[in-house]
Amino acid sequence: MSPHRSTIPRPGPARITLVLLAVVPAVLAYPWPTTRDRWVLGVGVAVALVLLSWWQGLHLTTIVRRRLAMLRSRSGAHTDRRAHSGARATAALRITASAAGGTLPLSLIAGYLNRYGLRADAVRITSRGSSPEGDAAGSDTWIGLTYSAAPNLPALQARSPKIPLQRTAEIAARRLADHLREIGWDTALVAGDEIPALIGAGARETWRSVVDGSGGHVAAYQVAIDAALADTLSRIRASNAEETWTTLEFADDGSQLTVAAACALRTGSAPDGAAPLAGLVPEQGNHRAALMGLHPLSGSRLDGHLGLSEGELAGLSWPVAAAGVAAR
């Protein structure tokens, strides 16, 4: 987990590779005695500037790509723009507090990344809260388990030659539900139609939000993974938005536990360009895809995963309202 926040986007491996492919030939041509060498230098500098320049936390090429994707989505079907690698399945359970108190056992839940010989692609906790002024004030919390076929192929083949990935995910979710019931939580496996959608089918995407059919604006945000993460999550839950969705996702990169977080805020008016809270990064031009990825059954891993130590995990908390208790 990073101790600092930065608005400068971090270039990925592909972007760095492209920059090096343009810059290295220019450097090797030094001192650029010929016209051709000077063209190589100019092209290298131009490519580096285009690929590394940014505005409001986004690379310029990312801004262009998202603008073009928005134009395409307005003239065709709306789909999740996130890439999926291979077959995967997700199962979710709804959880409410009872005798156990109001704070989820995050260490226990994260432990289901590797349990019963299966490796989960991600384990996520999602909470939805609505303001008391709404028609259905209250809160809901779900825990989702996502499994990919590739890393679990031997275990799946041992269970059945048909590779029952969805059934395996549901069995793992039931085992987690049983585990939570043993320590006093009320849980139940849920289907997709039992979880409300973040936006309606006819919602219209703009650069700063998605305009829902009711006229409300729903904006998605990445949550910075830094030393202030616990405080940021608390401020999201305490915000005065009409509706909030908050997600905390755990994964395992093979050497350590990682975490990512995101949220969505529904407001009556369009959000401005800046984030409403410190620690939030607006998903400018990518709100629809980000909102689809926030759904408890989406199966899409959140962006921005960073390493999380056991001590940092212990410092996080996730309160859950008891059944029938309003969120705020």
What do these predicted ranges mean?
Residues 42-134:
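N-terminal topogenic membrane-targeting module
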Residues 99-184:
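An amphipathic, basic-hydrophobic helix/alpha-beta surface used to engage anionic
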Residues 19, 23-27, 40-50, 60, ...:
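Extended aliphatic helical segments
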Residues 10-17, 59, 105, 116, ...:
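Alpha-helix initiation/capping motif
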Residues 146-149, 153-328:
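Membrane-proximal, solvent-exposed terminal domains/tails of membrane-associated proteins
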